[in-house]
A protein has these predicted regions:
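Conserved N-terminal entry element of GNAT/NAT acetyltransferase domains
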Residues: 1-14
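Conserved GNAT-fold acetyl-CoA-binding loop/helix
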Residues: 21-46
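Short loop/turn motifs at secondary-structure junctions and domain boundaries
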Residues: 47-53
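Conserved acetyl-CoA pyrophosphate-binding loop and the N-cap/start of the following alpha-helix
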Residues: 109, 113-121
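Conserved beta-strand-loop-alpha-helix junction that forms the acyl-donor binding cleft
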Residues: 110, 134-145
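Conserved GNAT acetyl-CoA-binding A-motif
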Residues: 119, 126-139
């Protein structure tokens, strides 16, 4: 296993959609029923604003897309391009935490350090941009990662 990381580009977007769909469907299903998983798809997904802002990472495992996630200076805490109520307003880093956003690990790559690497990349990049605090909203499937961090 050789994990590599880089900033996501618009060319990555077509490959991210099936990764996110697999993560939502397979990783949440132990805790949620089918209707709840479908409802999760309505509020979760990739926010291309993060890619445009240069704050979204992809992680590959031996060349295979294994995970993704980012951070944001914007007010939106969660949601993909299709999610209603997103807010692109810029946060004040002196008084407001940046957001850790849209973190997904492909189910075939869980428990291999992918999520931890994405989180570390996000925290380091946010700190380099002058951010002193971050916040996130987690799913029940992601909670163990964030509690261990």
């Amino acid at each position: 296993m050789a994990l590599t990381s880089r900033l996501a580009t618009p060319a990555d977007l077509p490959a991210l959609t099936p990764l996110v769909d697999a993560a939502i469907g397979r990783l949440l299903s132990p805790w949620l029923d089918a209707a709840q998983v479908e409802a999760s798809r309505a509020i979760m997904g990739v926010d291309t604003r993060l890619v445009d802002d240069g704050t979204y990472f992809v992680v590959e495992d031996d060349g295979s897309l294994a995970g993704c996630g980012g951070w944001s200076r914007r007010a939106t805490l969660y949601g993909g391009d299709h999610t209603e109520g997103r807010d692109d307003a810029l946060l004040d880093p002196a008084t407001q935490p940046a957001r850790i956003r849209a973190m997904y690990t492909h189910p075939d790559h869980t428990r291999r350090g992918v999520g931890r690497l994405v989180l570390q990349l996000c925290e380091a990049a946010a700190a380099a941009a002058g951010v002193t605090r971050v916040q996130l909203m987690a799913t029940v499937a992601g909670r163990p990662l964030y509690e261990a961090a």
